[in-house]
Amino acid sequence: MDKYKVAIVDDDEVALENLSFELGKDARFSLKGTARNGKQGKKLIAKVQPDLLFLDVEMPDMTGMELLQEIRGSVSWNMRIVFYTAYDKYMVQAIREAAFDYLLKPFEE
């Protein structure tokens, strides 16, 4: 069985490490890379072409929504997006932007 390629874009180091750790416990996922801001995330997504992208909504250089709008035209593979944030106020917008799911930080197993 092929593993799902995963990428995480999040400026919160602790949240990024926690999610990476939890994903590492599941044999279905292979974490291919992480990025700490939108600019790095854009490069990571193009390089890795993840099946599943965990994307923080609020980052210092651009929002996750802005990043998604920037890459939308260049994603030619089937990539699912999980918006990952501490603020539930973004849930409706995330779904409108074609989010596969929405995960609130901090998450619990």
Regions of interest found by a model, annotated:
Residues 27-31, 77-79:
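A generic structural motif
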Residues 42-109:
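CheY-like receiver
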Residues 9-10, 35, 53, 85:
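Conserved sequence signature across two-component system core domains
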Residues 22-26, 44:
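Alpha-helical interaction/dimerization surfaces of two-component signaling modules
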Residues 32-39:
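Conserved Asp/Asn-Gly motif in the active-site loop of CheY-like receiver
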Residues 3-14, 19-23:
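Conserved acidic segment of CheY-like receiver
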